[in-house]
Structure formats: structure tokens, C-alpha cells
């Protein structure tokens, strides 16, 4: 068995989000040896640039510009193409923000702690970057892995028509009927966006009102705006199972009328986010988490 290659650095950053890339660039500018580990080259720059703020607002703007006569599928495809072109440019800018420093090493792969200041990096599934295991030790290690969608344990939630806020940005085909599970900011943003793109949208909230973290008068006003746009909102509703079929996915527990379950062409599950630390081996670094 071949021993893994080793690297040493002054600073090791796990994850290319805003805080990590800024710190890495600053340390590299002062001549420090920096290693940046990112599991996917598609995430150079972090969530905001690649799958969060910028791409979603690009799609929101495109949806707002759609005219009534525009074909939803064709218009959505053009909007996604424009989104991807912009994100590709920003991703490349962020790559060079670090790669152009002589003291920075960029590693594509998945990191896991093997000691307090040492990680093992393995090739990401399907990745084209790292081809062998790598051990990296550093004086300072920064965990900058961000968050990921928190999906509830509901039967059928791994079905082909079930999406997160990331995958729905490239959904194919365009959903004539979209169900949104969760009535927080992300779910409602996508609900309004896809309604503007031309989908029939139903929002399903487990609680008795939308935007539970906001003041009640704010939530009431937002609900009125969404319903005026033609969005159906079901509160006090929980989906117990997703059943995929030839006509779409049936959401058992959500009333679609006449006593039958609601059926959708695509489902967005927007039920919150959690720290993306499950596979980091934090216990090996002596890090305790709740």
C-alpha cells in the first residue's frame, strides 16, 4: 500500500466560503503557506456565488421579466443558461483570487480530521482533481464548510422528483406543478420565482402560518402578496409520504381536492439547513458539537 502524500501549511482552510477565501487570500498576501480544500470545483467561491444568493437572484430577476406569452420551458432554459454563464465567470474569478498566489495550494477532495491539526483528503466521488490520498498538517485549521439542506426522514424523499434549492435551479423538465415544502424565506422565494416562470405552485407549511420566525403582521402581508400572485398556501399540513407515479409525485397528507392527495411534477423541500460537518471527523480534532 502506497503511503499518502503529505503537505504542511501555516493555514489550512476547509471549504471555499466567504470567510475562508478572504482569510486565505489575506494570509497568502503576507507570504504564509496556505492550503484550501474544496470538495468540488463547482463551489469555488462558496454557496453565495455558486448556488445561493447570486444565482437565485439572477433567476428571480429573469422570472420577473417574463411576459405572459413566453413559453415557460423555453424561457426557463434561457434563464438557466444566463445564470450558468454568470456563475461560471464568478467561479473563475474566485479561483484566481487564490490560485494566483504563489504560496497557495488548492486541493479538490473531501477532508476528514485524523488529528487536532491534521486532515486526510480523499478524492471526491466523480471528481477530476485529487487522484490519491493526501495528508495535510497545519498550524491553524479553519472549518469553513458552511451548511447543507436538512431533509426530514419521510418515505420517498429520495425520489427523482424531490429537489433541494440547489437541484431545483436546474430542474428538467420545467415543472407545470410545483409543491414547496416549508414556508421560510428560501421556500417562499422559490415559490414566487417559479410562479413567475409559469408554474402552478402550492406551498405546504407544517405550522399554522408562514414565516414563523417573522412578526405575525409581516407574515400576513407576505401571504397576501403570494396568494394574489396565484400561489396556494396550505398551513397545518404535513406530508407523510412521497409516492412517485406516471403523472407526478403524490404528496400523502396534503389535500389536492376531492379527498385525493396533491400531485406535483416537482417538489422543493425547503425545511431548513444544518452545518455540513457530519463527515469531517470532528471528534478526531477534539471538537465537540451539539
PLM region descriptions:
Residues 9-36, 187-195:
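N-terminal Rossmann-like FAD-binding beta1-loop-alpha1 element of flavoenzymes
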Residues 28-47, 199-210:
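Glycine-rich FAD pyrophosphate-binding loop
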Residues 105-108, 112-128, 197-290:
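A Rossmann-like FAD-binding core segment of flavoenzymes
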Residues 53, 145-200, 283-290:
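Glycine-rich dinucleotide-binding loop and its adjacent helix/turn
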Residues 3-17, 174-184:
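Beta1/beta-strand and adjacent pyrophosphate-binding region of the FAD-binding site
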Residues 17-22, 43, 48, 148-149, ...:
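Residue-level detector of alpha-helix initiation sites
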Residues 2-9, 47-138, 214-240:
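N-terminal Rossmann-like dinucleotide/flavin-binding domain of flavoprotein oxidoreductases
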Amino acid at each position: 500500500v502506497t503511503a499518502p502524500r503529505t503537505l504542511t501549511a501555516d493555514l489550512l482552510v476547509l471549504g471555499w466560503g466567504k470567510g475562508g477565501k478572504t482569510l486565505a487570500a489575506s494570509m497568502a498576501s503576507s507570504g504564509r503557506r496556505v492550503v484550501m480544500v474544496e470538495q468540488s470545483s463547482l463551489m469555488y467561491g462558496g454557496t453565495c456565488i455558486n448556488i445561493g444568493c447570486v444565482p437565485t437572484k439572477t433567476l428571480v430577476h429573469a422570472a420577473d421579466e417574463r411576459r405572459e406569452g413566453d413559453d415557460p420551458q423555453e424561457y426557463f432554459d434561457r434563464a438557466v443558461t444566463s445564470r450558468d454563464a454568470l456563475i461560471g465567470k464568478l467561479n473563475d474569478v474566485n479561483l484566481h483570487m487564490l490560485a494566483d498566489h504563489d504560496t497557495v495550494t488548492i486541493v479538490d477532495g473531501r477532508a476528514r480530521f485524523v488529528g487536532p491539526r491534521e486532515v486526510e483528503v480523499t478524492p471526491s466521488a466523480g471528481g477530476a482533481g485529487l487522484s490519491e490520498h493526501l495528508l495535510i498538517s497545519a498550524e491553524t485549521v479553519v472549518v469553513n464548510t458552511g451548511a447543507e439542506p436538512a431533509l426530514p426522514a419521510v418515505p420517498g424523499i429520495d425520489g427523482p422528483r424531490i429537489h433541494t434549492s440547489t437541484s431545483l435551479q436546474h430542474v428538467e423538465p420545467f415543472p407545470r406543478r410545483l409543491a414547496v415544502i416549508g414556508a421560510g424565506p428560501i421556500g417562499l422565494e422559490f415559490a414566487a420565482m417559479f410562479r413567475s416562470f409559469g408554474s402552478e405552485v402550492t406551498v405546504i407549511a407544517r405550522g399554522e402560518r408562514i414565516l414563523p420566525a417573522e412578526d405575525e403582521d409581516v407574515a400576513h402581508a407576505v401571504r397576501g402578496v403570494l396568494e394574489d400572485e396565484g400561489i396556494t398556501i396550505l398551513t397545518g399540513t404535513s406530508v407523510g409520504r412521497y409516492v412517485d407515479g406516471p403523472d407526478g409525485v403524490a404528496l400523502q397528507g396534503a389535500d389536492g381536492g376531492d379527498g385525493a392527495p396533491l400531485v406535483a411534477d416537482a417538489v422543493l423541500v425547503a425545511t431548513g439547513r444544518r452545518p455540513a460537518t457530519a463527515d469531517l471527523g470532528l471528534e478526531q480534532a477534539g471538537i465537540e458539537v451539539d
